[in-house]
Structures are given as structure tokens and as C-alpha cells.
């Protein structure tokens, strides 16, 4: 305010007519205080014919401009502006303190709250703070400002405490997990001071138990609630419901819920949230149906949590019905509800409807943007994901966070967008998210999918905090690239750093042992799975069955499978694969019947194992029947399915059918393997025409393939074309000089795996260990041969 305008205001207020109104004088005092003219404010105050409590509140504006310890603050005390408090009734003094404290409502005004508290004390209003009413509001003021330590100090200095005093702290502790453990020691003081708890007391204490996940203390409180007659209080019972749900005791929660007479929306919501939190999604949706049948109207929060359940369950039809009900019921959609709808459509793969919902959101927040970007990425719309990410960058707010980058990076994992992923990696580094575990895991997945293990290792090395998800990504990534030995090493290193393994990491490392035929190392991980209780997890069970099956111990695989309580299809497929690998066609087919009897729909893996079994045994008719059955069920055949069928009909000499299958197979470099199988069959059947055509197709893909030249030489030989045989032999000799040596590995000395090649003398220790193992195998063979001779001679 300028000097001129202030003078005009003073001239008006100092008229006799204006002086009769306290309202005018109160505003004049407030104006002088804001302009730091405290002496003028005191003069107006002294001349006031009528003073009320608002006069004091006008002076309280000084706290917005004057800090503790300043000269102006000292001047206030010197002028005695607050001495009027001594001439006010006690109830008005308490009310004035309360009104001042209620102006402090967040942590941003904590300094002002302390100034109010100190100024009231130093101005002589200490008598007011002896009132529990004033002190309780001081406690609430500090709680609202986020200073629970200061609130406790006020509580401890109170000469008289009542139930409201205790409830103020209980409520604060129940909302702050770091302070929740301080609540129960207070109950001893409460009992000592003969303060009787009420419904609010029990509600807050039960919420503390939920925060601490202390179901025993919660049950004890529930007994007191029943004893003191609060079991009919809906608010108290709802808090007990929430406590049991948070602690995972859904049976006790259901018993309490059944005893609640007047169930409101909060009680129903608590049961729905508890079911979803404990992965009982179907039960949560059933509670929602019962809620509707009971006539209780769902709230926006109800719709949001139920839609989240539909997202987790992938229940698209139910999600659509809930969306329709929201529209019909004229419920005013808020941002959390819109985000829940958006997440549901993204999770269920309906991106068209997801974009419609996103477009109707008036002011989408970062959760909205992250949901639409993640939905595009997860549903194969990588280009749209990047477009939405660029749109977000063009906006001033909100700014992308680690979840945004993770979703965008996932969209660039495909080879055609990999270059964008590298650019995003640069942005992540620039903005300081490179050490985020969430972003790091996505970067690892992107690099491994593009076969850049070294780049993935660099990302991993930057991470300071490595959780089990990050380690598992390294294990799975190396396993998929065929680096099974590295996968095992990473698991061992993870375990040494005291990271707890989970079912996914164990199943991945057991799969790596299976690929490398490292049975002894796999048995060690089997023991670890039993010790940690993950042997009951279906992914681990399937990996164990697969490992023992591939290593020739199908009986052990059968034992593990029989111990599984509710094996899933993956576990069934693993056992079926064990029978297939050993050519047990009859057992495989019988096991297939059991799969059908148990209500499972066979998938591509199921039929692959069956076709492989038929291929091993040469069961052509059975294989053709299964092939046609698979196609009738709409299961798309992959390369391995075609490989089994080509091998099967080629062994039977049906080269024309094999040629037809190859031409139907998906194109790619893998087709060379199919053509090579056909070429080998043509050698056996002396079919020169199809054989030459097969060789031509292989050499288009790999002109220097030695195996093809050898097969082609054999084809010429069986057809008597010796000049062509000689020509092929000359080519083979030229190719042999540039051929890369094959590698082998052997497991020796307690799970130590050594890699070597033919004639390799580079590592004497490896040569010695391999030679010792070879000698051991020879001795075993000689002993077995001698035993057989002894048995036969007898």
C-alpha cells in the first residue's frame, strides 16, 4: 500500500462514524501491521471504544512478515500489543489461540506455527495453554505441519490431558509409518491417567496395527473393542476389517464383515481392497457384485479399485460392464477413476478404447501419460508409444519420470526401434535416472533382446543398488543368448551378495543348467529351491522336471511332477518333453490324454513335444494326425514344429511332402536346417532332382556350408555322377581350411565346467582335467563290459 492510499484510509476511519465500528478499526490495525507501523497500530488499538477477539486476529497478521528475534518482533513485545489478552475471559483466550493455530495447515507454514506458539507464550498467554482445548489444537497444528516431534513435546508438557489429546497423537502415528511404533507405549500412560478410550481411540490404534502389520496386537485390540461395547460401531469395525486385510488374514476379516449390521460403502471397499491386495482378485470382484445386490451405491473409489482388479485379471468384459455402469449412473468421473479405466483398457489390449478414454481426460497427469505409453508398448504399438512420449516432452508439465522412461524404452526393444532406445538411454543418463533399478531393468531387457550383452553389462555395472529383479534380468538375458555358464555365475554372485532369490531367478538358472547338461550344479539349485520353499512354485517345478528329463533322469522328473499339488500346463509340458526326448511315444501319448482329462487346452509347446516324440520313433501316421489336430485347433506352427514334421516325413522317404512343408514354413535363415534335412533324405532315396533343388536353396543362404557340400557329394555318388563328386571334394577341401573349430565342455571337479576344442593345448590344466575325466569314463566302460561278459558266460 502506498503512503497516499494509506493516508486516505486513515482519514476515513478516524471519522467519528467509522470509529464506532470495530470492523473498521480492526482492518486499520491490520493495515498498520502489514506496513510495519506498529506504533500507529497501538494508537488505533488504544482509542478503540470496542474491542473484540478479531482485533487480536488482526494483529496476528504480523506473523506473515515478522520473524522471531527481529527488531520488529521485539517492538511488538515492548509495545505490549498483546497485553489485552489479560483482560479477556479464559474461554476467549483459548479460542484466540485455537483460531491462530488453525491458520497453519501444511508443512510449508511450520515456521509460522512455531512463531505463533512462541509469541503466544512470550506475550503472556501461558495461562491459555494450560487449557487442554488449546493444547490439543496446538498438537493438531504441529501434526498438520508434519512436525510430530514438536507435537509430542506439547503433549508431554501438558498439565492436563484428555482423550482428545491422546487421540490426536494416535491419529498422527497411524498416518506416519515411521512413527507408528510410538503409539502403543502411550496406551500405558493413558491407562495410568485413567483416561477412558473411545471409538476414535480404537480406530486409530487399529490403523497403527495395520501399518505395522501386527495381527496379534490387532486381535487383542479387537477383543477390547468387543468388551467395551464398540463392536456395533461401523467406523471401528471397518478399521478392524482393514487391519485384518492389510495383515493378510482374510478369514478373520470376513468374520468381522459378516457381523457388521449396517455395511456402508467404506466397509465393502475395505473387503474389496483386502482381497485384491492379497491376490484374491475373484473374491474381490465377488464382493463388488454382492455390494451391488445389497443396494449400496459404489463410490468413485469403489469403481477405481474394481477396475484395477479387472486389469490384473485381464477381465475385459467385466471392465466394459463397469464402464457402462459408471456412464449410466451419471457418476462424476474424477482423475483417479479415469486413470483406472485407462489402465484397464491398456491391460486388456483394447488400445482404441484406451485412446478414447485418454482423449476425454481434461488435464491428464503423469499417471495418465505413463499408462498410455506403457499400454502402447506392451501391446505392440511401439511407434504410437514413441509418439505419445514426444507429445509429453513438448508439454511444460508434467515432466517424465523413471516410469515414463521405462515404458518408452520398452517400446524401443524391437530391432527397428533400437536406435531410439539408445537415444533414450542418453536422456536417462542426462536426467540422472541411470541408477534407477526400474529404468535399469528395462535397459537390460532392451540390450539383451538386441544381443548386446556388453552394453547390458555396462548398465548393470552402473547400478549401485541391485535388487533380485535386476539380477534375474541378467541371468535370463545370458540364458536366452546361450551364455548359460555366465547365467549360472551371475546367480551365484547374486546369492553371495545376500540377495534373496525368487522363483523366477531359480527357474532361469535351473534352465541354464539344463541347457549345459550341468546336472550336479542343477541338483545344488534344486536343494536351494527346497530350502527356500520355491520348489512348489510351478515355474521352478517345470524347470526341474525339464532339467532331469534332459539329463536322462526321467524317473526323478516323474517324482518331482507327482509331488506338485496343482501342476500348471507348463509343468505338464515339461514332463511330456522328458518322455519325448527319450522317444517314449506311448508314454507321451498316454500323458497327453491325462493333460486333456485334467481340463488343460494343449498349446504349441505341448504339440511340439508330441511331434518330437513321433519324430524320434518314426511314428509317421501318429505325427500326421497330431499335426492336423494342431492346425484344426488354430495353433500356429513355428519353426520347430516344421522341423519335427520335415524330419518325420523325410525319415519315411516322403520327400515330396517334406518339400511341401518347407515351402509352407516361415521364411528365414533357419530354413537352411529344413532344406538340409530334405537333402539328407534325398541322398537316402536317390532323388537327384529334389536334392539338387534343396542344395541350391541352402547355398543361397550359406554359400560356404561344408555339410551341404558333403551331402551334395554323397547325392552325386549314389546317382553315379563321379565327376561331380570329384568337383565337390575339391570344394570341400578348400572350405575345410577356413572352418571354425567346434567347442565342447565337460563338468569336472565338483561343478567346474571347462570348455575346449579338438586338439586344444592352450590350457594345460583343462587338458589334464579333461584327460582324467576321459580315463575315468574308459574305466567305467571296461568294468561294465567285463561285467556283461561274466554274466553272459554264466
From Swiss-Prot:
Recorded superkingdom: Eukaryota
Sequence ranges of the PPR repeats: 131-165, 166-197, 198-232, 233-263, 264-298, 299-333, 334-364, 365-399, 401-435, 436-470, 471-501, 502-536, 537-567, 568-602, 603-637, 638-672
The keyword Repeat is assigned to this record: yes
Region (Type E motif): 674-749
GO biological process: RNA modification
InterPro entries, A to Z: E_motif (IPR046848), Pentatricopeptide_rpt (IPR002885), PPR_At4g14850-like_plant (IPR046960), TPR-like_helical_dom_sf (IPR011990)
GO molecular function: RNA binding
Keywords noted in UniProt: Repeat
Record carries keyword Amino-acid biosynthesis: no
Pfam families: E_motif (PF20431), PPR (PF01535), PPR_2 (PF13041)
Stretches for region Type E(+) motif: 751-782
Similarity comment: family membership: Belongs to the PPR family. PCMP-E subfamily.
NCBIfam families, sorted: PPR (TIGR00756)
Record's protein name: Pentatricopeptide repeat-containing protein At3g50420
